[in-house]
Amino acid sequence: MKKYGKRVIGVILMVLAMVLTQIPMPVLEATSATADFERDGDTLIHYTGTASAVSVPAGIREIAPEAFADQNGITKVYIPSSVEKIGEGAFRNCTNLKEVSLSDGLITIESGAFAGCSSLSGFTLPKTLETIGAGVFSGDTALKSINIGKNRLFSYADGVLYDRDQAKLIEVMPGREAETLNMPTKVTDIERYAFWGQEHLKEVTLSPNLSEIPEYAFSNCINLQKVSIPYSVRKIAAKAFEDCKNLGNITIPPSVTTIHDTAFDGCDNLKIRAEDDSAAQIFEQEREKNQVVSAMLQDDVAVGNFYNKQDARYRETVQVPVIMMSIIRLMFPIWMFQNIMPMIRLPFWGRQESYTIRQL
Protein backbone atom coordinates (compact mmCIF):
# COMPACT_ATOMS: atom_id res chain seq x y z
CA MET A 1 0.00 0.00 0.00
CA LYS A 2 2.85 2.33 0.84
CA LYS A 3 4.57 1.52 -2.46
CA TYR A 4 1.33 2.19 -4.32
CA GLY A 5 0.92 5.52 -2.56
CA LYS A 6 4.45 6.55 -3.45
CA ARG A 7 3.83 5.65 -7.08
CA VAL A 8 0.66 7.73 -7.16
CA ILE A 9 2.46 10.69 -5.64
CA GLY A 10 5.29 10.25 -8.13
CA VAL A 11 2.87 10.22 -11.06
CA ILE A 12 1.11 13.32 -9.74
CA LEU A 13 4.42 15.16 -9.39
CA MET A 14 5.45 14.17 -12.92
CA VAL A 15 2.13 15.39 -14.35
CA LEU A 16 2.38 18.61 -12.35
CA ALA A 17 5.91 19.21 -13.60
CA MET A 18 4.79 18.68 -17.19
CA VAL A 19 1.91 21.12 -16.77
CA LEU A 20 4.09 23.77 -15.19
CA THR A 21 6.60 23.60 -18.02
CA GLN A 22 3.82 24.46 -20.48
CA ILE A 23 2.67 27.54 -18.57
CA PRO A 24 4.45 30.68 -19.81
CA MET A 25 6.12 32.46 -16.95
CA PRO A 26 5.74 36.27 -16.84
CA VAL A 27 8.75 38.25 -17.97
CA LEU A 28 9.73 40.76 -15.36
CA GLU A 29 10.12 44.25 -16.77
CA ALA A 30 12.80 46.62 -15.65
CA THR A 31 11.10 49.21 -13.48
CA SER A 32 12.17 52.70 -12.54
CA ALA A 33 13.78 53.61 -9.22
CA THR A 34 13.54 56.83 -7.22
CA ALA A 35 17.12 57.73 -8.11
CA ASP A 36 16.19 57.82 -11.81
CA PHE A 37 14.27 61.09 -11.45
CA GLU A 38 15.67 64.60 -11.24
CA ARG A 39 13.32 66.79 -9.22
CA ASP A 40 12.89 70.42 -8.35
CA GLY A 41 10.44 70.38 -5.48
CA ASP A 42 7.27 68.75 -6.77
CA THR A 43 8.29 69.13 -10.43
CA LEU A 44 9.87 66.20 -12.27
CA ILE A 45 12.60 67.81 -14.38
CA HIS A 46 14.24 64.86 -16.12
CA TYR A 47 14.22 61.08 -16.21
CA THR A 48 17.70 59.53 -16.28
CA GLY A 49 16.88 55.83 -15.99
CA THR A 50 16.80 53.02 -18.52
CA ALA A 51 13.74 51.10 -17.34
CA SER A 52 11.07 49.98 -19.80
CA ALA A 53 8.23 50.43 -17.29
CA VAL A 54 8.23 53.81 -15.56
CA SER A 55 6.15 54.89 -12.59
CA VAL A 56 6.27 58.60 -11.87
CA PRO A 57 6.83 59.04 -8.10
CA ALA A 58 3.85 59.95 -5.95
CA GLY A 59 3.85 63.58 -4.87
CA ILE A 60 4.97 64.92 -8.25
CA ARG A 61 2.58 67.67 -9.36
CA GLU A 62 4.15 68.65 -12.68
CA ILE A 63 6.14 66.85 -15.37
CA ALA A 64 8.42 69.44 -16.95
CA PRO A 65 8.69 70.02 -20.72
CA GLU A 66 10.72 67.27 -22.44
CA ALA A 67 11.32 65.44 -19.15
CA PHE A 68 11.14 62.05 -20.92
CA ALA A 69 11.80 63.20 -24.49
CA ASP A 70 13.63 60.76 -26.81
CA GLN A 71 13.63 57.95 -24.21
CA ASN A 72 13.17 55.11 -26.69
CA GLY A 73 13.56 52.38 -24.07
CA ILE A 74 10.30 53.24 -22.32
CA THR A 75 7.30 51.05 -23.19
CA LYS A 76 4.92 51.80 -20.30
CA VAL A 77 4.30 54.84 -18.11
CA TYR A 78 2.16 55.16 -15.01
CA ILE A 79 1.30 58.70 -13.88
CA PRO A 80 -0.18 59.03 -10.36
CA SER A 81 -3.11 61.17 -9.26
CA SER A 82 -0.79 63.80 -7.76
CA VAL A 83 0.27 64.95 -11.25
CA GLU A 84 -1.77 67.94 -12.42
CA LYS A 85 0.23 69.01 -15.48
CA ILE A 86 2.22 67.30 -18.24
CA GLY A 87 4.51 69.82 -19.92
CA GLU A 88 5.14 70.55 -23.57
CA GLY A 89 6.86 67.67 -25.35
CA ALA A 90 7.23 65.77 -22.07
CA PHE A 91 7.21 62.36 -23.78
CA ARG A 92 8.10 63.54 -27.28
CA ASN A 93 9.64 60.91 -29.56
CA CYS A 94 9.38 58.03 -27.09
CA THR A 95 9.02 55.79 -30.12
CA ASN A 96 8.51 52.51 -28.22
CA LEU A 97 5.99 53.85 -25.71
CA LYS A 98 2.89 51.67 -26.06
CA GLU A 99 0.89 52.24 -22.90
CA VAL A 100 0.18 55.35 -20.83
CA SER A 101 -1.86 55.12 -17.65
CA LEU A 102 -3.20 58.49 -16.50
CA SER A 103 -4.95 59.07 -13.19
CA ASP A 104 -7.80 61.36 -12.26
CA GLY A 105 -6.24 64.54 -10.93
CA LEU A 106 -4.54 65.51 -14.19
CA ILE A 107 -5.75 68.93 -15.35
CA THR A 108 -3.48 70.00 -18.23
CA ILE A 109 -1.66 68.27 -21.09
CA GLU A 110 0.46 70.79 -22.99
CA SER A 111 1.27 70.92 -26.71
CA GLY A 112 3.11 67.97 -28.24
CA ALA A 113 3.28 66.11 -24.92
CA PHE A 114 3.12 62.71 -26.63
CA ALA A 115 4.09 63.73 -30.18
CA GLY A 116 6.21 61.25 -32.10
CA CYS A 117 5.22 58.29 -29.89
CA SER A 118 4.74 56.12 -32.97
CA SER A 119 3.98 52.91 -31.03
CA LEU A 120 1.25 54.41 -28.84
CA SER A 121 -2.01 52.68 -29.77
CA GLY A 122 -4.40 53.65 -26.97
CA PHE A 123 -5.12 56.62 -24.72
CA THR A 124 -7.81 57.47 -22.17
CA LEU A 125 -8.48 61.02 -20.99
CA PRO A 126 -8.90 61.40 -17.21
CA LYS A 127 -12.27 62.81 -16.16
CA THR A 128 -10.45 65.72 -14.47
CA LEU A 129 -8.66 66.90 -17.65
CA GLU A 130 -9.58 70.48 -18.54
CA THR A 131 -6.98 71.60 -21.10
CA ILE A 132 -5.24 69.79 -23.93
CA GLY A 133 -2.73 71.59 -26.15
CA ALA A 134 -1.97 71.55 -29.86
CA GLY A 135 -0.57 68.48 -31.57
CA VAL A 136 -0.44 66.35 -28.42
CA PHE A 137 -0.51 63.18 -30.56
CA SER A 138 1.19 64.44 -33.74
CA GLY A 139 3.07 61.64 -35.47
CA ASP A 140 1.51 58.88 -33.34
CA THR A 141 0.73 56.78 -36.39
CA ALA A 142 -0.47 53.73 -34.42
CA LEU A 143 -3.09 55.79 -32.58
CA LYS A 144 -6.38 55.26 -34.40
CA SER A 145 -8.72 56.28 -31.60
CA ILE A 146 -8.83 57.47 -28.00
CA ASN A 147 -11.27 57.09 -25.13
CA ILE A 148 -12.64 60.17 -23.40
CA GLY A 149 -14.07 58.04 -20.59
CA LYS A 150 -16.12 60.06 -18.10
CA ASN A 151 -14.65 63.40 -19.14
CA ARG A 152 -17.41 65.91 -19.88
CA LEU A 153 -15.29 68.72 -21.32
CA PHE A 154 -14.38 66.91 -24.54
CA SER A 155 -16.21 64.97 -27.23
CA TYR A 156 -15.00 62.39 -29.70
CA ALA A 157 -16.35 61.07 -32.99
CA ASP A 158 -14.96 59.35 -36.09
CA GLY A 159 -11.34 59.55 -34.96
CA VAL A 160 -11.54 63.25 -34.10
CA LEU A 161 -11.21 64.97 -30.71
CA TYR A 162 -13.35 68.08 -30.15
CA ASP A 163 -14.27 70.27 -27.23
CA ARG A 164 -17.58 69.47 -25.55
CA ASP A 165 -19.78 71.41 -27.99
CA GLN A 166 -17.78 70.55 -31.14
CA ALA A 167 -17.05 74.24 -31.62
CA LYS A 168 -13.32 73.51 -31.67
CA LEU A 169 -11.64 70.68 -33.55
CA ILE A 170 -8.64 69.79 -31.39
CA GLU A 171 -6.95 66.92 -33.18
CA VAL A 172 -7.52 64.16 -35.70
CA MET A 173 -5.99 60.88 -34.58
CA PRO A 174 -2.85 60.26 -36.66
CA GLY A 175 -3.77 56.61 -37.26
CA ARG A 176 -7.26 57.41 -38.58
CA GLU A 177 -7.66 55.42 -41.80
CA ALA A 178 -10.64 57.16 -43.41
CA GLU A 179 -9.77 59.05 -46.59
CA THR A 180 -12.40 61.77 -46.23
CA LEU A 181 -13.58 64.08 -43.46
CA ASN A 182 -16.67 66.27 -43.40
CA MET A 183 -16.18 68.76 -40.60
CA PRO A 184 -19.24 69.32 -38.39
CA THR A 185 -21.00 72.62 -39.05
CA LYS A 186 -20.63 73.55 -35.37
CA VAL A 187 -16.87 73.91 -35.74
CA THR A 188 -15.69 77.53 -35.67
CA ASP A 189 -12.07 76.92 -34.69
CA ILE A 190 -9.32 74.43 -35.55
CA GLU A 191 -6.36 73.86 -33.25
CA ARG A 192 -2.84 74.20 -34.64
CA TYR A 193 -1.41 70.89 -35.94
CA ALA A 194 -4.93 69.39 -35.87
CA PHE A 195 -4.41 67.32 -39.05
CA TRP A 196 -0.62 67.24 -39.04
CA GLY A 197 0.87 64.20 -40.78
CA GLN A 198 -2.42 62.54 -41.74
CA GLU A 199 -1.23 59.85 -44.15
CA HIS A 200 -4.61 58.49 -45.26
CA LEU A 201 -6.57 61.71 -45.64
CA LYS A 202 -7.37 62.68 -49.25
CA GLU A 203 -10.35 65.01 -49.05
CA VAL A 204 -11.62 67.51 -46.46
CA THR A 205 -14.76 69.63 -46.41
CA LEU A 206 -14.34 72.45 -43.91
CA SER A 207 -17.09 73.78 -41.67
CA PRO A 208 -19.15 76.66 -43.17
CA ASN A 209 -18.59 78.52 -39.90
CA LEU A 210 -14.79 78.26 -39.81
CA SER A 211 -13.02 81.63 -39.75
CA GLU A 212 -9.32 80.70 -39.95
CA ILE A 213 -7.05 77.85 -41.04
CA PRO A 214 -4.30 78.04 -38.40
CA GLU A 215 -0.58 77.35 -38.44
CA TYR A 216 0.43 73.82 -39.48
CA ALA A 217 -3.22 72.73 -39.52
CA PHE A 218 -2.78 70.39 -42.52
CA SER A 219 0.99 70.36 -42.69
CA ASN A 220 2.58 67.16 -44.00
CA CYS A 221 -0.70 65.60 -45.15
CA ILE A 222 1.13 64.00 -48.04
CA ASN A 223 -1.91 62.39 -49.70
CA LEU A 224 -4.34 65.29 -49.31
CA GLN A 225 -5.75 66.13 -52.75
CA LYS A 226 -8.85 68.24 -52.22
CA VAL A 227 -9.92 70.87 -49.68
CA SER A 228 -13.21 72.75 -49.83
CA ILE A 229 -12.73 76.20 -48.29
CA PRO A 230 -15.98 78.00 -47.35
CA TYR A 231 -16.74 81.72 -47.61
CA SER A 232 -16.54 82.04 -43.83
CA VAL A 233 -12.74 81.70 -43.88
CA ARG A 234 -10.84 84.99 -43.57
CA LYS A 235 -7.25 83.87 -42.97
CA ILE A 236 -4.85 81.07 -43.95
CA ALA A 237 -1.91 81.10 -41.54
CA ALA A 238 1.77 80.13 -41.82
CA LYS A 239 2.57 76.59 -42.97
CA ALA A 240 -1.15 75.72 -42.94
CA PHE A 241 -0.74 73.33 -45.90
CA GLU A 242 3.03 72.88 -45.87
CA ASP A 243 4.29 69.82 -47.79
CA CYS A 244 0.85 68.70 -48.98
CA LYS A 245 2.58 67.45 -52.10
CA ASN A 246 -0.50 65.97 -53.76
CA LEU A 247 -2.77 68.95 -53.20
CA GLY A 248 -4.03 69.91 -56.66
CA ASN A 249 -6.57 72.53 -57.70
CA ILE A 250 -7.97 74.49 -54.78
CA THR A 251 -10.50 77.32 -54.88
CA ILE A 252 -9.95 80.12 -52.38
CA PRO A 253 -12.96 82.43 -52.00
CA PRO A 254 -12.64 86.24 -51.95
CA SER A 255 -13.56 86.21 -48.26
CA VAL A 256 -9.96 85.18 -47.55
CA THR A 257 -8.09 88.46 -47.11
CA THR A 258 -4.89 87.15 -45.51
CA ILE A 259 -2.67 84.33 -46.77
CA HIS A 260 0.74 83.87 -45.17
CA ASP A 261 3.70 83.64 -47.54
CA THR A 262 4.49 80.11 -46.31
CA ALA A 263 0.91 78.80 -46.21
CA PHE A 264 1.45 76.47 -49.18
CA ASP A 265 5.20 75.83 -49.00
CA GLY A 266 6.13 72.50 -50.56
CA CYS A 267 2.81 72.08 -52.39
CA ASP A 268 4.46 71.18 -55.67
CA ASN A 269 1.29 70.37 -57.62
CA LEU A 270 -0.90 73.18 -56.32
CA LYS A 271 -2.95 75.42 -58.59
CA ILE A 272 -5.01 78.10 -56.82
CA ARG A 273 -8.26 79.26 -58.38
CA ALA A 274 -9.47 82.67 -57.27
CA GLU A 275 -11.57 85.65 -58.31
CA ASP A 276 -9.97 88.64 -60.00
CA ASP A 277 -8.24 91.13 -57.72
CA SER A 278 -8.76 88.94 -54.66
CA ALA A 279 -6.02 88.31 -52.11
CA ALA A 280 -5.86 84.72 -53.30
CA GLN A 281 -5.28 85.74 -56.92
CA ILE A 282 -2.49 88.12 -55.94
CA PHE A 283 -0.95 85.42 -53.76
CA GLU A 284 -1.06 82.90 -56.60
CA GLN A 285 0.53 85.32 -59.07
CA GLU A 286 3.44 85.99 -56.72
CA ARG A 287 3.76 82.29 -55.92
CA GLU A 288 3.99 81.41 -59.61
CA LYS A 289 6.66 84.07 -60.17
CA ASN A 290 8.69 82.74 -57.27
CA GLN A 291 8.43 79.23 -58.68
CA VAL A 292 9.72 80.40 -62.06
CA VAL A 293 12.70 82.18 -60.55
CA SER A 294 13.44 79.26 -58.25
CA ALA A 295 13.45 76.87 -61.19
CA MET A 296 15.67 79.13 -63.32
CA LEU A 297 18.20 79.85 -60.62
CA GLN A 298 18.23 76.60 -58.70
CA ASP A 299 21.53 75.40 -60.15
CA ASP A 300 23.08 78.76 -60.93
CA VAL A 301 22.73 80.92 -57.83
CA ALA A 302 25.38 81.08 -55.14
CA VAL A 303 24.79 82.92 -51.89
CA GLY A 304 27.66 84.67 -50.15
CA ASN A 305 28.57 87.85 -48.27
CA PHE A 306 29.62 91.20 -49.66
CA TYR A 307 31.45 93.83 -47.62
CA ASN A 308 30.21 97.33 -48.30
CA LYS A 309 32.83 99.93 -47.39
CA GLN A 310 30.32 102.77 -47.31
CA ASP A 311 28.41 101.46 -44.32
CA ALA A 312 31.18 99.14 -43.06
CA ARG A 313 29.11 95.99 -42.81
CA TYR A 314 28.53 92.73 -44.58
CA ARG A 315 25.44 92.29 -46.66
CA GLU A 316 23.91 89.16 -48.06
CA THR A 317 24.65 88.74 -51.77
CA VAL A 318 23.53 86.41 -54.50
CA GLN A 319 25.57 85.53 -57.58
CA VAL A 320 23.36 85.46 -60.65
CA PRO A 321 24.31 84.77 -64.29
CA VAL A 322 23.83 87.89 -66.43
CA ILE A 323 21.18 86.36 -68.66
CA MET A 324 19.12 85.40 -65.62
CA MET A 325 19.40 88.90 -64.19
CA SER A 326 18.02 90.33 -67.41
CA ILE A 327 14.97 88.09 -67.13
CA ILE A 328 14.48 89.01 -63.47
CA ARG A 329 14.55 92.74 -64.34
CA LEU A 330 11.72 92.28 -66.80
CA MET A 331 9.55 90.07 -64.60
CA PHE A 332 9.74 91.60 -61.13
CA PRO A 333 9.40 95.02 -59.52
CA ILE A 334 12.52 96.23 -57.71
CA TRP A 335 10.76 96.53 -54.34
CA MET A 336 10.43 92.76 -54.14
CA PHE A 337 14.16 92.47 -53.50
CA GLN A 338 14.72 95.38 -51.13
CA ASN A 339 14.48 93.31 -47.96
CA ILE A 340 15.53 89.99 -49.42
CA MET A 341 18.68 90.70 -51.42
CA PRO A 342 20.31 94.06 -50.55
CA MET A 343 23.20 93.47 -52.98
CA ILE A 344 23.53 91.39 -56.12
CA ARG A 345 26.85 90.34 -57.61
CA LEU A 346 26.79 89.79 -61.36
CA PRO A 347 29.55 87.69 -62.92
CA PHE A 348 30.35 88.42 -66.57
CA TRP A 349 33.30 87.89 -68.91
CA GLY A 350 35.74 86.76 -66.28
CA ARG A 351 35.20 89.54 -63.76
CA GLN A 352 32.55 90.45 -61.22
CA GLU A 353 30.95 93.75 -60.36
CA SER A 354 28.67 94.61 -57.48
CA TYR A 355 25.45 96.55 -57.83
CA THR A 356 22.83 97.69 -55.41
CA ILE A 357 19.24 96.90 -56.27
CA ARG A 358 18.54 100.55 -57.01
CA GLN A 359 21.34 100.61 -59.60
CA LEU A 360 19.89 97.75 -61.64
Where do the protein language model's features map onto the residues?
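N-terminal secretory signal peptides that target proteins for export/translocation
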Residues: 1-4
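Sec-dependent N-terminal signal peptides
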Residues: 6-18, 22
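Structural signature of tandem-repeat unit edges
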Residues: 7-9, 33-36, 48-62, 72-85, ...
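Sec-dependent signal peptide cleavage junction
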Residues: 20-35
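GGW-centered surface loops in extracellular recognition modules
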Residues: 35-46, 307
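Consensus positions within tandem repeat domains that build extended binding/scaffold surfaces
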Residues: 65-67, 87-90, 111-113, 134-136, ...
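Short, structured coil segments at secondary-structure junctions
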Residues: 286-288
